[in-house]
Every structure is written in C-alpha cells, then in structure tokens.
C-alpha cells in the first residue's frame, strides 16, 4: 500500500496523494478550464494593442492620446491582482475565478460600445480588475491539483493559453477589423468569457488543499478529491497538508514577507516586473512601430501575433526543463536570450521575413520566461499564502506592464525610431536575468 493510501481512519496527506496517483480526467478538466480562463485573459489583455491603429484612425486621435487607454487596463490589473490573492486565500479560489471572468467579460463587451476616449479609459480599467484577478488564481488552483513531477510543465502549458489568446487576438483582428471594425474584437473578447463563467460555475472544483487548510469539513474535502482515486479517498479518516504546521495562524502577508520568503518575494517582483516591461512595450506598440515603418495593417497585426505565438511554442519546453533542471537558471537563460533577440529585431527592419522570424524567436524567449514565473512562485509559497504570493508577484509586475506601455508612447513621442526602442529593451532583459538567478542563489525554501 502506498504511503498516501492510509488505512481507514488515518490522515491522508493531500499533496502526497496527488503525487502518487496518475493524472485523472478530473485533473485534466481543471487544466483545460484554467487554460481557457488564461486564453481569454490573454485575448482581452492584448486587444487594445491590436485595435489601436484602427481606433486612432476612426476617432482621429494621435498615438499619445491612446497611451492612457492602453495603461488603464494594466492599472486595473494591478488592483485586481493585489486584491484577489488575499480574497482567494481567505474565501477560496473558485469563487474569485468565476467573479474575475464575469468582470473582464462584461466590461470588455461594454468597451465595444464606447464612443470616446474617456469612456474607453474607464471601461478598460474595469476590465483590468477582472483580468488581474484571473491569471494568478488560475495558476494557484492548477498548481494545487498537479503532482510535483508535472507541476511546472502543466502550469506553463496552461500559460500557453495566455500567449495563444494574445496571438489569437492578432489573427482575429487581422481578419475582423478590416471587415467589421475595431468593435468586433472587443465583442468577441466579451461574449466568450461570459459563456465560460457559466461553465466554471458547474465544472470547476475548489482547491482541496485550500479546503484542508481552512478546515472546511472532511466530507467536503472527500467529495472534492474522490474523482481522482475514489477508493484511496474513501479509506481516509481525515486529510492534512503538512506545511500547515509551519505557518499556521499567520497572516498571508506575514508569510510572504517573512525572513524565509521575504527576499525571494522581492526578487520575484523584480524579475516579473522587468519581463513585463519587455512584453507590454512590444505587445502595445509593435504593430504601431511596424505601421510607422511602412508595413500594412495586416502585416503589422500578423507580426504582432507572431510575438505572442512564440510563447506558445516555448512554454511547454520551459516547463519541461524546469521539472528536470535548475528552474532559476532555465528562466534566466530565456530572459538573456530575449534581450539579444529583441536587439536583433531592431536591426532587421528591411527584410520582412527575417524580421518575422526574429520576432517569433524573441517572443519564444521572453514569453516563455514570463509563462514560467507563476509556476516558480507557486512552488515557492506555502498553501496559506500561495494565492497572495502569486497574485502579488503578478500585481506588482503589472507596474512593469504599465511602464512598458507608457514608455513606448513616450519614446515614440520623443522621436525614437524602431531600432532605438528595441535596443533599449536590453536593460530590462539584463535586470530580469540577474533577478531570477540571484533568487535561485538565495532561496532556502521551496514550499509546495
């Protein structure tokens, strides 16, 4: 009998139980639902970058006027992420996730009917509240349903959904906007999440580890875990999470800022912040930079989509490598290469084929690294503070996204050209590399 398969009346260690079982259809369902949440999160997050050229032309506004609108959703994401983590650690992952999807779906749909910049700015901020809450809590829930041997692989695979959603926004906009206008992308990005929220209400389970830590009742925990291995769960008299003893009765903020976790938290924030500077400068402004350099609207949207699609190609490989090698070194290498290839993109404007290839590779590097960071954070923090730790990393990181979107508008306003803007990305790439490598050297905890 396996260690987790205790005799009747004995306590069942939830994580050991999950580790020892083959991945069930029930767990694959959690993977799929979290993937869909993150996919639609990515589609709505990237929407402004893709509709900006058409919106600017229709409303007769310059690029600088769109800077605050592009940043509005990112500011909302900060508040959504920072607020949702503590809520999920107190009340549960599922309810927060369903609410997040309803919020970003509803306000994305409303954004399609905005008639001026002020309306769009407010609606994009409100959309951002839901977007900011969705991703970290999907990461937390999925990480708590996955065995250690597959944790990084499955979480980074889920994050393929974010990059695929952003890329999908580019491909959809290339076809839909010329035919139906900029509103069409926002309508799609609003209706689909509202439909998904209905599915989540029925099919998404609560985290069993959360139920144990919060003492939500043996029968409820048993019902939640039974689909994985009914006989093993039926034999258990109670359920436990061993880490609970080490951090019990402490607030979530005391956990993530304690001596054990404090420095690691700061380094996670630095790394994710710098990575998002790169991602959002390119996501928000690469199509516009391409248009300014003579590319057609279709070419600009396609190359912008390639940047996101690169993350889809690399995320699974990064997760696989993290489960087998030093995860900090794996991520650090990808950030370093992101800076190198972003610089190369800036040197290749004259050849559209070479440019597209380099954009794809740059996207593979930086988006692959970014997709891996939530998995790294989820492995680092204990259950009591996991949602807060992951969501605060993503929330603080959003300031990097705001800086990236804002700096693109500022640099273009100062007259910087395509090559100069791309060269500047060497700085955040270097800082992200240093941040994650140093975290690997100083971390002494790997709470799972």
Swiss-Prot record:
Q: What is its main location?
A: membrane
This protein's GO CC annotations = plasma membrane
Q: Does the keyword Transmembrane apply?
A: yes
Per the UniProt entry, the effect of residue 89 to N is: Abolishes 4-HBA transport and chemotaxis
- Lineage: superkingdom: Bacteria
Keyword check for Transmembrane, yes or no.
yes
User: Which Pfam families does the record cross-reference, listed alphabetically?
Assistant: MFS_1
**In Gene Ontology terms, what is one molecular function of this protein?**
carboxylic acid transmembrane transporter activity
Q: Know the name of this protein? A: 4-hydroxybenzoate transporter PcaK
Lineage, top ranks: Bacteria, Pseudomonadati, Pseudomonadota, Gammaproteobacteria, Pseudomonadales
- The gene that this protein is the product of is pcaK
């Amino acid at each position: 009998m396996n260690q987790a398969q205790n005799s009747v009346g004995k306590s069942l260690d939830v994580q050991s139980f999950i580790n020892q079982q083959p991945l069930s259809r029930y767990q694959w369902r959690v993977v799929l639902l979290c993937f869909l949440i993150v996919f639609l999160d990515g589609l709505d997050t990237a929407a402004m970058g893709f509709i900006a050229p058409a919106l600017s032309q229709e409303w007769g506004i310059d690029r600088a006027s769109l800077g605050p609108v592009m940043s509005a959703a990112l500011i909302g994401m900060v508040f959504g992420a920072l607020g949702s983590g503590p809520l999920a650690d107190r009340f549960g992952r599922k309810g927060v996730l369903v609410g997040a999807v309803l919020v970003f779906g509803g306000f994305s749909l409303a954004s399609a009917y905005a008639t001026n910049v002020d309306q769009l700015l407010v609606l994009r901020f409100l959309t951002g509240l839901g977007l900011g809450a969705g991703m970290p809590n999907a990461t937390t829930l999925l990480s708590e349903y996955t065995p250690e041997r597959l944790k990084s692989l499955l979480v980074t695979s889920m994050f393929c959904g974010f990059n695929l959603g952003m890329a999908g926004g580019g491909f959809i906009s290339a076809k839909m906007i010329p035919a139906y206008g900029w509103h069409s992308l926002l309508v799609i990005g609003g209706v689909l999440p509202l439909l998904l929220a209905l599915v989540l209400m029925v099919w998404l389970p609560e985290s069993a580890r959360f139920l144990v830590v919060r003492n939500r009742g043996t029968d409820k925990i048993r019902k939640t875990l039974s689909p994985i291995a009914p006989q093993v769960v039926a034999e258990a008299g109670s359920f436990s999470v061993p880490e609970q003893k080490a951090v019990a009765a402490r607030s979530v903020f005391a956990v993530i800022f304690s001596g054990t976790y404090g420095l690691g938290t700061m380094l996670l924030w630095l790394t994710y912040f710098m990575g998002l500077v790169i991602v959002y400068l390119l996501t928000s402004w690469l199509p516009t930079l391409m248009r300014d350099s003579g590319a057609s609207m279709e070419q600009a949207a396609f190359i912008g989509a390639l940047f996101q699609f690169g993350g889809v190609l690399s995320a699974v490989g990064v997760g696989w490598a993290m489960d087998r090698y030093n995860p900090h070194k794996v991520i650090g290498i990808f950030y370093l290469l992101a800076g190198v290839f972003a610089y190369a993109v800036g040197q290749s404007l004259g050849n559209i084929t070479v440019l597209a290839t380099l954009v794809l590779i740059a996207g593979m590097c930086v988006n692959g690294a970014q997709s891996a960071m939530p998995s790294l954070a989820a492995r680092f923090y204990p259950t009591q503070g996991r949602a807060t730790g992951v969501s605060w990393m993503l929330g603080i990181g959003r300031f990097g996204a705001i800086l990236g979107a804002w700096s693109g508008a500022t640099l273009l306003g100062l007259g910087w050209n395509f090559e100069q803007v791309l060269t500047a990305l060497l700085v955040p790439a270097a800082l992200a590399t240093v941040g994650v490598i140093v975290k690997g050297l100083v971390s002494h905890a790997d709470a799972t």
